[in-house]
Each structure stands twice: as C-alpha cells, then as structure tokens.
C-alpha cells in the first residue's frame, strides 16, 4: 500500500471462506461433526494471529528554544503510515516511515540533537518490522529509513493516546455514504472512537474489527487527517453488495425450499455477513439433525449481488463386510453370506451417508439374531470426497441344544398353572443365509407339543422383504377349558396334528401382513388315550360326529405395532376361513381382533386393552372362544366365565414404578360371550352353568426379566371369590 504524507491509514483484508482442497475434504470426512468457518470466526482467528499493530502518533509540543543548527524542515510533519497485511500464513509486517529533508550527512549525534531542538511541532517515528515468532526478521529500508529510536517497544506505541476531534464514516473515496442507514450501522458499531476522545492504536484497531463484524461492510480503513481543529478520524468503508440471487452447488439432498427459506429475508437487502452465518448454521444444522455427512464448504459473493453457496456432501462409494473373531477381535472368515447382510441395509452406494440411517441399519442387522455385535466405520475414499463404509460383524454361535421350563394353562385346580419342561435344537443361520430351523419338545403333566419350524426371513429374489415359515406340529392340550368340571372328575385332552405354510411381509411402516394355508386334524381323547366323541354331559366333542375333525384354513392377518414396548399402541386383525376341499372338511369363518393403547400420566401408565371375535359356520366345540383366567378375566379360573361363538373382553390397568424393575399394578377386567354360549354345539358352557359374563379386579406386582414381565396378581371376581394369577410376558 502506498503511503501518503498527510494521513495515517489502516487497511483490512476482505474475508472469504476458501474452497477446500482435496486434502481439506479428507479432513472434512474425518471430522464429521465440524462446522464451516464463519466470517466472524475467521476474522477472530486472524485477529488472534496478530502480534501487534504499531503506529507512532505523538502529541504536538513546543520545547523551549535552543541554540542549535537545524536543517530546513517543514513546520509540521505528519508522515507516518501504518499498513496491516492479513493473510493465512504470511508474516505480519508493519513499518513506520518518516520522510524528512534532513541533511543525513551530518553525524548521528548532531542529527539527534537537531531533532531534540526543534521549535516547530514534530512527530517522531521509527522504522520497525515485526514478524511471527521464530521467523527471521529482515528490514530493507531506503535512504529515508530512520533508525535512531530502536528502543521504542510495540506495547508502548500501542498504548500512546492521540486526541481525536472528529469521527466520520465515509466511502473508500472519502465521500459520504449514499445510504444513511449503513452509516448509522457503522457508527453504532464503534465503542471507543468518539469525538473529543484520546485514543490508542489498539482501540482504533478494535473498532475497525467491530465495523467489519457488524456484517454490512467488506472493508474498513481508518484514516487520520490533521486539520486546524485537530485530528479527524475517518473510517473509509466499502459496503457489501445488495443480495440479488443465490446459486447453490452440489446440494443433492438439501431441499431447495429449505435453502430459499434460509435466505429469503435477505433478498433485496445489503448482504449481511451475520445473516449469512445464521443461514449457513441452519443449513449445517439441517444436515446434522438428519445425521447426514454434509456441510457448507464455501461461500462467495459474485458480481451483481449473486451469492454462491458450495456444499460438500459425502456420498457412499462402497460398502464392505468385515467379520471379526469373537475372542481376539481380529478379522476372520465369516459363515454368513455378505449378500445376506448387505440386502438388509437401506444405505446404498451413491447416497449421501446418514449416521441415523446407519444406526438403523445396525439395529436391523442385530435383529437378524445371528450377530453378537455390529458397527459401521466410515472412511474417506481417497481424494474423491466420498466415503467407504466398513461394517464390522461379530457372529454368534449358529446353533445348539437348549433346555428350559415354562408355564402351562393345563392345570387349573390350584392358584398356579402347571409347570412344563422343554428341550430344543435350533440353528439360526442355515446355509449362511439367516434361515432358521427349530425342533422343540415341550412336556407337562397334561400338555405336550412337538414342533418343527423352518423360517426364511427374507425369500431370495424378493424385494418386498417377504418371509416364509413352514411348520409341522403335534400337540396335546387339556380340554377342560371348554369341557372341564366333569362330575366323575375325569379329564380329556384335545390332540391336534397341524401343518402349514405362512408368508409375511411389511406393507407399511409399523404394519405387517401375513397370509397362510394350514391343515389341521383334531380330536378328543380320554385319560387312557382312547378317541371319544362326547363328554360326560353327552355334549359332542367334534363337529362332524367322527373321532376327528379335519380343516383346511386360509389365514389372513394384519398387525400394527407402535414403538414395540408394553405401553405402546397395538392393533391386530385376524381372519380364518375353513375351506371345504373335501365334503367332510369343516367350513366356517372366524374373525378376531385385539387392540391396546397406553397413556402415560406422569410416572404412571394407564393401559387399556380390548379383544373380541366371532365365528360363523360349522366348527368344533373345542374351538369356541374361552373367557376367564390369567389372560382374560382375572379372578376366575381358566374358562370359568364361559365359552361362546362370540366374545368381548376389556381390561384397564394402572401401573406405577415401585423400585428398580418392580412395578405395582391395579386392574379391572370384564368379559362376556354376548349370549352366544348356547350356540356352540352341545352348549358345553350351559351344561356347566357358566355365567357367560363376569368381571374381576385386583392388584399385583410385575418384575422385568429376560423372559419378559413376570406377573403375580391377586384378583376378586364378581362372586367375591379371590384367586392368585401368575404369568410370563404381556397379556394376550
């Protein structure tokens, strides 16, 4: 910057966020949570890199006359110029230069004495050059460089005060600003610089930054002019352009509507850096809220008031699967086909990577049941600005034998249901394709179930995530739920041989549908295992009058689940149609529905559930709807309220935390067969004098466990009889 002999000038550089180099894009990917540098923070960082700003302005003085020889000098000198260079890595160079008409051929001492003996006002200044620490300092000056005052320190000159008589804001050409509102903005930003105030260089420098930080100006140069009334301080500013348009580059997923909303308030107004910063922050926040790898990387103002916004979005370049050893954590060969895992992911190549989407993908892979641990590691894909994803998977043991126990509803004479034992073999990952095979045997005092189940969670080649399940089962369950309480204390069991296939798939978020075809061969047997067709009351045990009923069922089911916890909303609808493929096969239609709704009231939770069903056609008596018991109307034994062709059961529960995993609960239940008990073949409920409707109420405790909630409850029915109930899991 060229110097003038009649002013003191500060110049500041305009600030621009530079476009990232490939190396900086690499840094962008490694620091996912970093935000773009704003104009204000960039200016602040630049200010921190300044060591000092130096200028020598000394008050006029009139020393007593001395008899010394002096050269022909002007009566007034104000020839100091200060220049400030701001750069990313360049040193800061400050110099103070004085142009004089001294006869420098005289000796050094004589010149010093001459300066001290001036009777006219004189501003003395030194020539200094400052660089960053640890950098070499070089000073190359011409013949006019003054070197006498090397002892002046930076801090001392910065703290010297100069009386300012007037403070003005002007254009860079010294003219008045056309827009007075901008002039007022600049004046309002000043803190120290006021008329008739003594200022230091540091205070002037700080006010320069305040004007820049107001956001309306791209440059500000303080100029000191000596007038007859004193020193006038002018801030020569260059306002920003008016905002006339916006160009956004590389924003593939950022909605254009969101960009327009972020910048809408600034159209037609002078560009304000602070408002641009707010817009950039909102855009970066949009990416962060969605977990997207995106950031505003550059912003620039073009001619005509066009703002150019550049966005860096990290697209997925490649996705790979890496299996890790369960014990050592080292890479190993996995048993699962990588394609089986990759097709579970919603993240695809070419998409902008989302951490939230990646978390959902991790949860999906864990839900397959074959992985012990899953994590996603994003890595830069070279200098392409894209990202490679590595999914680390630790596999669980694929299969084995297990044994356990459970609760059966077969024994109803005591407060607790009978215990059953189980033995099973399962394979979670057949052929490395996440296919499941389960062979189990459950045995109780009366109950017994042998089941073979094969499930393919996702049929290969299907893009709708359709699953297939094939089941073969042989079961024996107590018949006393419908045909119990026989006077001779005899008991009977219902034997069923079932085989079927079902297909399930999600068809909407939180909605799942199932369709299947099931064949059933069922009949009743006495305690010795002999087939029987009538009970003690001569009520038929089969619909066909034969020892066994055979049915081909076509099944349709739709289930809605909310968040999945026990207090969330749930709705299920099921319809089964008996197909008379052969004349003796049963033909009927059965419809059932269940709904549950939870409401949180402070720490407590209110849960309301409702279930019901109806059967039309010819069906087996033991297939009637059973009312009463732990999962129906508490306070009654299993099936003690009634059994009918139709039913409705409602329940209300208020649960509240007690301590840790323990909850207390207060409940009431009501159930009715809607007068349909007599329409069941043989009217087994009427023969046993079941009321057909009833209610119960009580209280209990629940404990969370790996098996699900353990429920211990005590309830009274409408006959004032009390009964304990114990159950595992949520009520049906």
Curated annotation (Swiss-Prot):
<keyword id="KW-1002">Plastid outer membrane</keyword>
<feature type="compositionally biased region" description="Low complexity">
    <location>
        <begin position="11"/>
        <end position="20"/>
    </location>
</feature>
<comment type="function">
    <text>Plays an essential role during early stages of plastid development.</text>
</comment>
<keyword id="KW-0150">Chloroplast</keyword>
<comment type="similarity">
    <text>Belongs to the OEP80 (TC 1.B.33.2) family.</text>
</comment>
<dbReference type="GO" id="GO:0009941">
    <property type="term" value="C:chloroplast envelope"/>
</dbReference>
<feature type="region of interest" description="Disordered">
    <location>
        <begin position="1"/>
        <end position="23"/>
    </location>
</feature>
<dbReference type="InterPro" id="IPR039910">
    <property type="entry name" value="D15-like"/>
</dbReference>
<dbReference type="InterPro" id="IPR000184">
    <property type="entry name" value="Bac_surfAg_D15"/>
</dbReference>
<feature type="region of interest" description="Disordered">
    <location>
        <begin position="135"/>
        <end position="154"/>
    </location>
</feature>
<dbReference type="GO" id="GO:0009536">
    <property type="term" value="C:plastid"/>
</dbReference>
<protein>
    <recommendedName>
        <fullName>Outer envelope protein 80, chloroplastic</fullName>
    </recommendedName>
</protein>
<dbReference type="GO" id="GO:0009707">
    <property type="term" value="C:chloroplast outer membrane"/>
</dbReference>
<dbReference type="Pfam" id="PF01103">
    <property type="entry name" value="Omp85"/>
</dbReference>
<dbReference type="GO" id="GO:0009658">
    <property type="term" value="P:chloroplast organization"/>
</dbReference>
<keyword id="KW-0472">Membrane</keyword>
<dbReference type="GO" id="GO:0009507">
    <property type="term" value="C:chloroplast"/>
</dbReference>
<dbReference type="InterPro" id="IPR034746">
    <property type="entry name" value="POTRA"/>
</dbReference>
<keyword id="KW-0934">Plastid</keyword>
<feature type="domain" description="POTRA">
    <location>
        <begin position="314"/>
        <end position="396"/>
    </location>
</feature>
